[in-house]
């Protein structure tokens, strides 16, 4: 990346955060559905692949902003289990793009203390990409900066089925009593185990759906939808999303504290 991701040692996130935002009321964990790459390219008379390239730059910028502004975790929906149904040349391009970006950016991620994890059924990915993912995960595991989760070959329903199978296997082996299965034990079997659930979901391109993304984890997340295509998502768009988040009263199923 051309600029540092994480906050420098002599500058605090509160100093970098836009003054319109309350630095004490930022979401801890932001999730993004990066939609609109193809339409962004088509609107400019470009191949869809160019939209994906531009989308990578938007993701790099968003990661940098989240780190600088004091957001602890960013989870991005990069490639869903349904995306395999796209044209083969587009899928192949995306796999190659993932490989090239990892090879190019890993050193910077290490230097800036970003901890990166890839969430999903990774065994179905090309072998070279699997190796790069394993290397990146291992080399950044001890980093204490922003947590960057990249959902790759990920599907929320498949994740829940996988978790249920793992719990069933434990019960069948006598390691877990069925009546002891609770929310915590199921959450521990999800790809996101150990990560706080997202406080805010941002979806670009104006689509109002969650597309099989983090079905369990988004139970109490605030949702912000913007008409901006993902390649055009920038600091102003992120600030608007965070202002929207800070305008909400999060009740988690209860009453507003101000309600008599």
UniProtKB/Swiss-Prot annotation:
The keyword Transmembrane is annotated on this UniProt entry: no
GO biological process: polyprenol biosynthetic process
Binding site for substrate: 36-40, 48, 52, 80-82, 84, 86, 203, 209-211
Region entry Disordered, spans: 1-22
Cystine pairings recorded for this chain: none
Residues binding Mg(2+), per UniProt: 35, 222
UniProt keywords, alphabetically: Magnesium, Metal-binding, Transferase
One Gene Ontology molecular-function label: magnesium ion binding
EC number: 2.5.1.-
Classification via Gene3D superfamilies: Decaprenyl diphosphate synthase-like
The organism's place on the tree of life at top rank: Bacteria
InterPro entries reported in the protein's UniProt record: UPP_synth-like, UPP_synth-like_CS, UPP_synth-like_sf
Listed Pfam families: Prenyltransf
Cofactor: Mg(2+)
Manner of cofactor binding, per the entry note: Binds 2 magnesium ions per subunit.
Class of enzymatic activity (EC top level): transferase
Family: Belongs to the UPP synthase family.
Function: Catalyzes the condensation of isopentenyl diphosphate (IPP) with allylic pyrophosphates generating different type of terpenoids.
Subunit text: Homodimer.
Protein name: Isoprenyl transferase
Species of the source: Parasynechococcus marenigrum (strain WH8102)
């Amino acid at each position: 990346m051309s600029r540092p991701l994480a906050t420098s040692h002599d500058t605090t996130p509160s100093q970098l955060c836009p003054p319109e935002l309350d630095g004490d009321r930022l979401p801890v964990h932001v999730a993004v559905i990066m939609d609109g790459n193809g339409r962004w390219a088509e609107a400019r008379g470009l191949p869809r692949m160019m939209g994906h390239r531009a989308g990578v730059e938007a993701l790099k910028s968003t990661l940098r902003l989240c780190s600088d502004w004091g957001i602890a975790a960013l989870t991005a929906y990069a490639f869903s289990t349904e995306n395999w149904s796209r044209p083969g040349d587009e899928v192949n391009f995306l796999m190659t793009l993932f490989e090239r970006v990892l090879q190019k950016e890993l050193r910077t991620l290490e230097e800036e203390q970003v901890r990166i994890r890839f969430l999903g059924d990774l065994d179905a990915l090309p072998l070279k990409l699997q190796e790069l993912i394993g290397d990146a995960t291992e080399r950044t595991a001890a980093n204490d900066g922003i947590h960057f989760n990249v959902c790759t070959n990920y599907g929320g329903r498949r994740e829940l089925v996988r978790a249920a199978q793992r719990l069933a296997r434990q019960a069948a082996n006598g390691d877990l009593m069925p009546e002891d299965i609770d929310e915590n034990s199921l959450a521990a079997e999800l790809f996101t185990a150990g990560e706080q659930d997202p406080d805010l979901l941002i979806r670009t391109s104006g689509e109002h759906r969650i597309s099989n993304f983090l079905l369990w984890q988004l139970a109490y997340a605030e949702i912000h939808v913007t008409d901006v295509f993902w390649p055009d998502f920038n600091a102003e768009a992120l600030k608007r999303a965070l202002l929207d988040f800070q305008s909400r009263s999060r009740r988690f199923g209860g009453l507003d504290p101000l309600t008599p």
